[in-house]
Amino acid sequence: MALTTENKAAIVADYAQSKGDTGSPEVQVALLTARINDLTPHFKEHSKDHHSRRGLLHLVSQRRKLLDYLKGKNVERYRTLITRLGLRK
């Protein structure tokens, strides 16, 4: 299921660096993580849905690229983010 506007607004408010910040890597990674977490149960029921799985892999790849970018720019912000989101590492 897609993220609702209220859920998106809550995520943006939690991870934004300043008011109205939707483009920082933290916000983008948090939104991608929420979308990935919403898609994951779908694959438990529909294991042969390869078309959607390709989209999921694209989201995971996009999140990885943003995390790598953030790690290169500011390691402390990277570590804080992965701890808050509960990502491994």
Curated annotation (Swiss-Prot):
GO cellular component, one term: cytosolic small ribosomal subunit
Keyword rRNA-binding: yes
MF terms (GO), sorted A to Z: rRNA binding; structural constituent of ribosome
GO biological process: translation
InterPro entries from the UniProt entry: Ribosomal_uS15, Ribosomal_uS15_bac-type, uS15_NS1_RNA-bd_sf
Keyword tags: Ribonucleoprotein, Ribosomal protein, RNA-binding, rRNA-binding
Family: Belongs to the universal ribosomal protein uS15 family.
Function: One of the primary rRNA binding proteins, it binds directly to 16S rRNA where it helps nucleate assembly of the platform of the 30S subunit by binding and bridging several RNA helices of the 16S rRNA. Forms an intersubunit bridge (bridge B4) with the 23S rRNA of the 50S subunit in the ribosome.
Subunit-level organization: Part of the 30S ribosomal subunit. Forms a bridge to the 50S subunit in the 70S ribosome, contacting the 23S rRNA.
NCBIfam families in alphabetical order: S15_bact
Name of the featured protein: Small ribosomal subunit protein uS15
Gene: rpsO
